[in-house]
UniProtKB/Swiss-Prot annotation:
InterPro entries tied to this protein: ATP_synth_F1_ATPase_gsu, ATP_synth_F1_gsu, ATP_synth_F1_gsu_CS
Localisation: Cell inner membrane
GO molecular function, one term: proton-transporting ATP synthase activity, rotational mechanism
Entry's family note: Belongs to the ATPase gamma chain family.
Keyword Manganese listed: no
Subunit architecture: F-type ATPases have 2 components, CF(1) - the catalytic core - and CF(0) - the membrane proton channel. CF(1) has five subunits: alpha(3), beta(3), gamma(1), delta(1), epsilon(1). CF(0) has three main subunits: a, b and c.
Protein's recorded name: ATP synthase gamma chain
Predominant subcellular localization, coarse grouping: membrane
Length: 293
């Protein structure tokens, strides 16, 4: 059994760790609130872009952009968004499981896959377990610009435009609330019907005006579809950042609480040992006094 000195040293060590985890919990809570605000600010832009694109697409049924054209699937690409740092519970592990399950379904149909990664945890995952990574970006911080994230996204879109990829998926953690993060795999291109459907986009076709487009619908669609996809990717990254901070806050709270439980248990053992030592000393004193008398 450990001595009183060893137990005191353990308690001191755990208290130091508890201070660190409590501080990390508070920092994560603050960062989560800021990430939530940025995420909420970005949503109206993404939804507005979706409505504009939907209106343009439905106004010009003659032109089909490559991003709206389905083709037979021989090779798929995944844009994977992970965190740069750990200590976030099972956030990244659950996302990897979701991704691998989705990839396995395609592999069972002899469809190949390649990956573009945002976040160092995703890069580390593929280094350990294999997988063709065509592009990656790390250290993107808590408030990245799209320019920081553009390289892997553009690499995937170029491969799709060149016919090397037949479908692209976006993989990230959706922020539900402070306690819940949901791993998501969603089709990016070709755009799913729900992305360009008037009803799903919130457009009332009965009250919709007929616009004059300059220079022409094709040019507008070509430009806006790229911006729309950029907005989807950026919003996914914002969701993942908020998810990361909320998961870290929860994990650090659990670590802080567990440290408190360990301290209480060790304190109980310490008190019992100390009580036993005092009792033994008293017994020795009483025994010695009795022997003298």
């Amino acid at each position: 059994m450990a001595s009183l000195k060893e137990i005191r040293a353990k308690v001191t060590s755990i208290k130091s760790t508890q201070k660190i985890t409590r501080a990390m919990q508070m920092v994560a809570a603050s960062k989560m609130r800021r990430a939530q605000e940025r995420m909420e600010v970005g949503r109206p832009y993404a939804e507005s872009m979706r409505r504009v694109v939907s209106h343009l697409v439905n106004a010009s049924s003659d032109y089909k952009h490559p991003y709206m054209t389905n083709r037979s699937v021989n090779r798929v690409g995944y844009i994977l968004v992970t965190s740069d740092r750990g200590l976030a519970g099972g956030l990244n592990i659950n996302l990897f499981k979701k991704l691998m399950h989705h990839v396995q379904e395609f592999q069972n149909q002899s469809v190949e896959a390649e990956f573009a990664v945002i976040g160092s945890k995703g890069v580390s995952f593929f280094k350990s377990f294999g997988g063709k990574v065509t592009s990656a970006v790390t250290d993107y911080g808590d408030n990245p610009t799209f320019e920081q994230l553009n390289a892997p996204v553009q690499a995937m879109l170029d491969d799709y435009a060149n016919g090397r990829l037949d479908r692209i998926y976006m993989v990230y953690n959706k922020f539900v609330n402070a306690m819940t993060q949901q791993p998501i795999v969603t089709q990016l291109v070709p755009l799913p019907d729900s992305a360009i459907d008037s009803a799903d986009a919130g457009i009332n076709t009965e009250l919709s005006w007929d616009y004059i487009y300059e220079p022409d619908v094709k040019t507008l669609i070509d430009g806006l579809l790229n911006r729309y996809i950029e907005s989807i990717v950026y919003q996914a990254v914002m969701e993942n950042i908020a998810s990361e901070q909320s998961a870290r806050m929860v994990a650090m709270k659990a670590a802080t609480d567990n440290a408190g439980d360990l301290i209480n248990d060790l304190q109980l053992v310490y008190n019992k040992l100390r009580q036993a030592a005092i009792t033994r000393e008293i017994s020795e004193i009483v025994g010695g006094a009795a022997a003298v008398s």
